[in-house]
Regions:
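Beta-propeller domains
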Residues: 92, 184-190, 194-334
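Blade-loop segments of beta-propeller domains
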Residues: 71-140
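A short beta-strand motif characteristic of beta-propeller blades
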Residues: 74-80, 121-131, 174-183, 243-248, ...
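Asp-box/WD-like beta-propeller blade repeats and closely related beta-sheet repeat scaffolds
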Residues: 113-197
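Short, conserved, GDST-rich strand-edge loop motifs in beta-rich repeat architectures
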Residues: 37, 43-54, 150-162, 205-229, ...
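Beta-propeller blade signature
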Residues: 57-63, 162-172, 221-240, 378-390
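Beta-rich, blade/repeat-based domains predominating
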Residues: 25-33, 54, 81-93, 131-147, ...
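Loop/turn-rich, solvent-exposed surfaces of beta-rich toroidal or solenoidal domains
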Residues: 299-383
């Protein structure tokens, strides 16, 4: 029933209004400590489920080093004591801390992952996002030099889609807020952000607000006015001035943004969820443009692309589609014309996808949103690890998050013992 209802909802959204991170190759360019060898851990930010285990959101640590006796096993978990739709997380620029939050709340939990990478611990809870900025539902945590730029999805006044970004220092002190553009075609909505320092450009994308994303699917699809309240834009910002400039119309919900990591490239790519299209953002002359450049699966079947992961050379792109449970690989040798070269069903529902820096290991999780995940036997909740040889994804391990009473597996970040550092002296 849940699967059928979600299809109906998505079809209605397409007809009425366009709908609206993850791994070693999509971190902020200001993070210097990248794991370029074998990662030791995958940190999984996990939604709590009432009646399963402690019911709390938690950060779960899984050992993913094949040489370890604990390979593919959960070795640690840190409950927050709350259940607030745990969603995304991001490293500080020094990679000592991991910031994580939920879409149903304004709290941000700060985990120390440097003192003992195998056993993260909560060292701070930031709770003034709503009070200081007026935003609600922190989504993206993007490292800046000594700072963290947080993109929210909603606001505290009407819990709609009008939102913005908040800037903090690494100690958790609020510095400034920036509203998403509402002029020159802007709709005020937000979702992801990504920076190209060489071009002094910040890109943002758009989704919807708390009032929509927290509603049960069945209720939402019956509300015609609510269905009109989804974003369909991307914006180019002057990074240094933190001012929005050109706004692009990108139908179908542009979600995750990935800049090519090739030093010779200055383009970014995103996937539009409801139209199943790939969009390229690039500079032509002095103007930034957005182009539809590819199709993901059969758009009429609404595969729902939800997460993407770009290879370190900018030549390949992984795309996960939630509804059909498929993981696809696109050749980006010509970013103007992406070509799908591989696909595999990796779950009954799949959401986030992460890859190692060398591209040889791929990790996939299952949960989208608590009220949007499938029901019954299709509601698989897992972390699955795969090996990639350039031709085939080969299954290596699985952690069943329901069986182990952990919750719904969502966002991932990679950890390494090589990044262990002593706590700085106060």
């Amino acid at each position: 029933m849940r699967h059928t209802t979600l299809i109906a909802l998505l079809t209605l959204v397409i007809a009425t209004s366009p709908l609206a991170n993850a791994d070693e190759t999509c971190n902020s360019p200001y993070i210097a400590k990248l794991i370029k060898g074998q990662e030791d851990y995958v940190y999984v930010w996990t939604l709590g489920v009432e009646g399963i285990g402690d019911g709390s959101d938690k950060l779960v640590t899984v050992d993913v080093n094949p040489k370890s006796k604990r390979y593919g096993k959960v070795i640690h978990s840190v409950p927050t004591g709350s259940r607030v739709e745990a969603h995304h997380m991001g490293f500080t620029d020094d990679r000592r801390h991991l910031w994580a939050g939920g879409l149903a709340d304004n709290r941000i939990w700060v985990f120390d992952i440097a003192t003992d990478p195998a056993k993260p611990r909560i060292v701070q809870t930031i709770s003034d996002l709503g009070e200081k900025s007026g935003w609600l539902g922190p989504h993206t945590y993007y490292a800046m030099p000594g700072r963290m730029l947080v993109q929210a999805l909603s606001n505290t006044q009407d819990k709609g889609g009008r939102t913005g970004m908040a800037l903090y220092n690494n100690k958790g002190k609020f510095i400034a807020s920036y509203a998403m553009p509402t002029e020159n075609g802007g709709d005020g909505y937000g979702y992801d952000l990504a920076v190209n320092p060489r071009k002094n450009v910040l890109l943002t994308s758009s989704f919807t607000g708390y009032a929509n994303y927290m509603r049960p699917i069945g209720d939402l699809m019956k509300d015609g006015e609510a269905m009109k309240k989804f974003g369909a834009t991307m914006a180019v910002w002057d990074l240094k001035a933190m001012k929005a400039g050109k706004v692009f119309s990108v139908p179908g919900a542009p979600l995750e943004i990935r800049w090519s990591l090739n030093p010779k490239d200055d383009w970014a790519i995103t996937a539009a969820a409801l139209t199943s299209k790939l969009w390229l953002i690039k500079q032509e002359g002095k103007e930034w443009v957005a182009k539809e450049v590819g199709t993901i699966g059969d758009p009429s079947k609404i595969p729902l692309p939800v997460d993407i992961s770009i290879t370190r050379d900018g030549k390949g792109l992984w795309v996960n589609t939630f509804m059909d449970g498929k993981t696809r690989y696109f050749d980006l040798s010509n970013p103007e014309a992406p070509k799908q070269t591989y696909e595999k069903v990796t779950g009954k529902q799949v959401n986030m996808i992460s890859q190692s820096w060398d591209g040889k290991r791929v990790y996939i999780t299952s949960s989208l949103l608590a009220s949007w995940d499938k029901g019954g036997a299709d509601n698989e909740q897992f972390l699955r690890g795969f090996a990639w040889d350039g031709k085939e994804l080969s299954h290596r391990f699985e952690v069943d998050f329901t069986k182990q009473k952990l919750g719904r597996a969502h966002h991932m970040k990679l950890g390494s013992n090589a990044l262990r550092t002593a706590a700085p002296k106060k």
